[in-house]
């Protein structure tokens, strides 16, 4: 009898815990994905803050030339970063217990791998939590689908690209200047500006910004006035009201006259689907482009593609970009090798031509 009562009590405690985890009445919804998200994101955030402030220099290239990234070692907010895991580690799983000492783990950039792995699990759990809350509330799942775009982008630069290049040292540093360094080196080695998927991503991000600004300004400009001219238009609305607060017909008519009739939407669902899908698909394509370039399927190369009847090269903008790429690649990892592969693998041009 006592054992039965204990089992019932335990089941009741577990049941109460499950109800609390999955309750939509909480101020912040937790959910089962939240059980995984909270500790992983807290770990990633805590280690990032400590490493950004106090981590010692990291031997990023694996050649015994440590690079400083933390504030306490001479950097500021702009130049500081969490330096990627050493090239000597490559793609090996490198938790603290795999190192001979904490100093060795820090020297080889262990915090970067710890942050990236926990961050990846955390953002995937956040996406699952969005779906879970939508499911509990009887909503459709498209919020999580939209969030999959930044998740795909982060996965591409922090995981897929290092895997394709063979080392976590090729991942994006966790800092402002480190991000720009990653972008410059990526252009030098992969010619990303000439990759169609990157072009689609640019169109998605800038187009999404434009459409968002246009939509917000049109809605704000076509509010249905519920007050007199002596009162604020905002006074006529209350949070959660069922009635629409703006006149889509008026907005459609304005925009149709501003450009042409079929340039605007007269259906609210079609409009908002377009506003969502445009930037999401753009970022999806960018993430896919990064993932293909990770395995050296690079952007288009039109170098020296225009020649005259005598075979002499007529330089185009592609040749200027190529020269800039070589210059950036020469500056990258200048102590790790004498020449970038592009320069070392071709014959020197004749000076008599």
From Swiss-Prot:
Keywords of this entry: Acetylation, Calcium, Chlorophyll, Chloroplast, Chromophore, Electron transport, Herbicide resistance, Iron, Magnesium, Manganese, Membrane, Metal-binding, Oxidoreductase, Phosphoprotein, Photosynthesis, Photosystem II, Plastid, Thylakoid, Transmembrane, Transmembrane helix, Transport
Membrane topology of the entry: Multi-pass membrane protein
EC number per UniProt: 1.10.3.9
Gene Ontology CC, one term: photosystem II
Domain of life assignment: Eukaryota
Binding site for chlorophyll a PD1: 198
Binding site for Fe cation: 215, 272
Modification sites for Phosphothreonine: 2
Residues that span the membrane, as ranges: 29-46, 118-133, 142-156, 197-218, 274-288
Site (Stabilizes free radical intermediate): 190
Binding positions (chlorophyll a ChlzD1): 118
Modified residue annotations for N-acetylthreonine: 2
Cited InterPro entries: D1/D2, Photo_II_D1/D2_sf, Photo_RC_L/M, Photo_RC_L/M_CS, PSII_D1
Record: residues binding pheophytin a: 126
Keyword check for Electron transport: yes
Subunit structure: PSII is composed of 1 copy each of membrane proteins PsbA, PsbB, PsbC, PsbD, PsbE, PsbF, PsbH, PsbI, PsbJ, PsbK, PsbL, PsbM, PsbT, PsbX, PsbY, PsbZ, Psb30/Ycf12, at least 3 peripheral proteins of the oxygen-evolving complex and a large number of cofactors. It forms dimeric complexes.
Name of the protein in its database record: Photosystem II protein D1
Organism of origin: Ostreococcus tauri
């Amino acid at each position: 009898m006592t054992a039965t009562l204990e089992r019932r009590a335990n089941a009741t405690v577990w049941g109460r815990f499950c109800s609390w985890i999955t309750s939509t009445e909480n101020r912040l919804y937790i959910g089962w994905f939240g059980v995984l998200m909270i500790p992983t994101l807290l770990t990633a955030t805590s280690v990032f803050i400590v490493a950004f402030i106090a981590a010692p220099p990291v031997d990023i290239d694996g050649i015994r030339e440590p690079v400083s990234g933390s504030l306490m070692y001479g950097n500021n907010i702009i130049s500081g970063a969490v330096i990627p895991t050493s090239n000597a580690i490559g793609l090996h799983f490198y938790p603290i217990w795999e190192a001979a000492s904490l100093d060795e783990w820090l020297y080889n950039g262990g915090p970067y791998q710890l942050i990236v792995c926990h961050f990846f699990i955390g953002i995937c759990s956040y996406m699952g939590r969005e779906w879970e809350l939508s499911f509990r509330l009887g909503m459709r799942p498209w919020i999580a689908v939209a969030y999959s775009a930044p998740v795909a982008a982060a996965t591409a630069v922090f995981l897929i690209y290092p895997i394709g290049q063979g080392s976590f040292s090729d991942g994006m540093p966790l800092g402002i200047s480190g991000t720009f360094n990653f972008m410059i080196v990526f252009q030098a080695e992969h010619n990303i500006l000439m990759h169609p998927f990157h072009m689609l991503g640019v169109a998605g991000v800038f187009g999404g910004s434009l459409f968002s600004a246009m939509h917000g300004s049109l809605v704000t400009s076509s509010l249905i006035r519920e007050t007199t001219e002596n009162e604020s238009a905002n006074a006529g609305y209350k949070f959660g009201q069922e009635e629409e607060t703006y006149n889509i017909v008026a907005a459609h008519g304005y925009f149709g006259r501003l450009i042409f009739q079929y340039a605007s939407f007269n259906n609210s669902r079609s409009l908002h689907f377009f506003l969502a899908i445009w930037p999401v698909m753009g970022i999806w394509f960018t993430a896919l482009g990064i993932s293909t370039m990770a395995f050296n399927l690079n952007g288009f190369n039109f170098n020296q593609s225009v020649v005259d009847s005598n075979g002499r090269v007529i330089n185009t903008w592609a040749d200027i970009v190529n020269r800039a790429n070589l210059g950036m690649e020469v500056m990258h990892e200048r102590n790790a090798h004498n020449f970038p592969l592009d320069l070392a693998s071709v014959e020197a041009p004749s000076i008599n031509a």
